[in-house]
Amino acid sequence: MATALATMTAPVRFDFQNNNVEVMTLDTLRRTHKENDIYGNPVKGIYHYEVIERMTDICKKYNLNYEVEEIFAAQNKNKAQPGVVVLPQVEEKYGENAVEAHVLRRVYATIRIKNWETDELTTTLVVAFHQDGIQAAIGPCVLVCHNQCILSPERSVSNYGKDKVTTEELFGRVDGWLSNFEEQMNEDRERIRRLKEKKISAVEMYAYIGLLTALRVSHDSSDKRFSSKVETYPLNQSQISVFTEDLLKLAEEKQTLTAWDVYNCATELYKPGKTDLPAMIPQNGALAEVLLSDRLN
């Protein structure tokens, strides 16, 4: 028992000097430094670990079989408000790079819901906590590669941006998803079936690559006629290059491509360390919208 206790309470250290992303447990996240305002309250009104706890409470409310699967924290290049800050005065107490000395402003967590899980798919509730605010989304997750699917605009919510809600309304939206879990899960799996049945010719494959490029260019254009039409692009330019190469390789290996293959090539990029945390959820949803619609017609 003493050995087990020693292991559980052993100090944990982060190394964001060499790692852009660190993985941790919920207990470790709770131990990180709490960022408060001048009144001693959480800067975002709620701590990152409390957001995850609220999500798990909703899972419990509906007797769902869940586990907090992965928690990531990421650094970013924002010098004014970096994703990770190390406090030297706290290091003096706990040691160099101690967990307790870290302020984590960019956290991404996945909560796996195992009800009606298959050999191919589970369902994941994802949470992003960062400098802009809080995001949540739900959808199927491909077990073999951990590729997250967000297959409808109704499956994501945030407390900032164009369609922002309050933090409590965000939790209310999640409650709505989980209260109708089986029905919404079946709707998403039907969308996957449609993607799998949608054959993609070589011409269509190149058309999708061109469309994704056009959406990116339009979004970033200084011409409002174009930028006003694209709120979120599915892939940025560097991602389009990686996606295109991966898709071309897949086309060499498979006789027939489907829209599901195209989607999975892109969702491989929507992971911490590959996509900026605040962009992971909206880009994923934007891509599904393109593939499930008839944008090429």
Label each PLM-derived region with a short phrase:
Residues 60-103:
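A short acidic/basic microdomain associated with nuclease active sites
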Residues 1-53, 62-63, 67, 72-76, ...:
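Feature for intrinsically disordered/low-complexity regulatory segments and propeptides
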Residues 56-57:
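Compact, well-ordered interaction domains used in eukaryotic information-processing assemblies
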Residues 1-14, 88-297:
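Intrinsically disordered, low-complexity regions enriched in serine/threonine
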